[in-house]
């Protein structure tokens, strides 16, 4: 197979995301982990910080690269010559939303979406939940790559002053 995009906000990247990237990298020649820029969302980490953390956590995957994009994902796919999108699915709610997006992307551009069922060990994980639990002092160390865990705790401490 050729290349695939793995899009998301990745604020921050979790072990669940990393599992999807690893599995996608085993199926595609190239995987472009794409930080989608949403100017209406104020993240814990800015886009450059997220990209840096993604590069660090995917460095062991030689066919994975990191990029960012503002706009329609299918426009980025077209620009990159990529014809596939890979999304991890945690549950039926994810499926309903992602299926609708996949059908729209197919209609707009012909790009196919491939779904990877999330490893059950990570099926409850979301970046939002991890940030919330960490903010209140919960232990999320086994939910994040070590470098991300450290940066998250540092950022929470910075915000507390």
Swiss-Prot record:
GO CC list: cytoplasm
Function: Reversibly transfers an adenylyl group from ATP to 4'-phosphopantetheine, yielding dephospho-CoA (dPCoA) and pyrophosphate.
Pathway: Cofactor biosynthesis; coenzyme A biosynthesis; CoA from (R)-pantothenate: step 4/5
Lineage of source species: Bacteria, Bacillati, Actinomycetota, Actinomycetes, Mycobacteriales
Gene giving rise to this polypeptide: coaD
Assembly and interaction partners: Homohexamer.
Molecular-function annotations in GO: ATP binding; pantetheine-phosphate adenylyltransferase activity
CDD domains: PPAT
Family the entry assigns: Belongs to the bacterial CoaD family.
EC top class named in words: transferase
Keyword annotations from UniProtKB, A to Z: ATP-binding, Coenzyme A biosynthesis, Cytoplasm, Magnesium, Nucleotide-binding, Nucleotidyltransferase, Transferase
Catalytic activity: (R)-4'-phosphopantetheine + ATP + H(+) = 3'-dephospho-CoA + diphosphate
Record protein name field: Phosphopantetheine adenylyltransferase
Residues reported in the UniProt entry to bind ATP: 9-10, 17, 88-90, 98, 122-128
Cofactor: Mg(2+)
E.C. numbers: 2.7.7.3
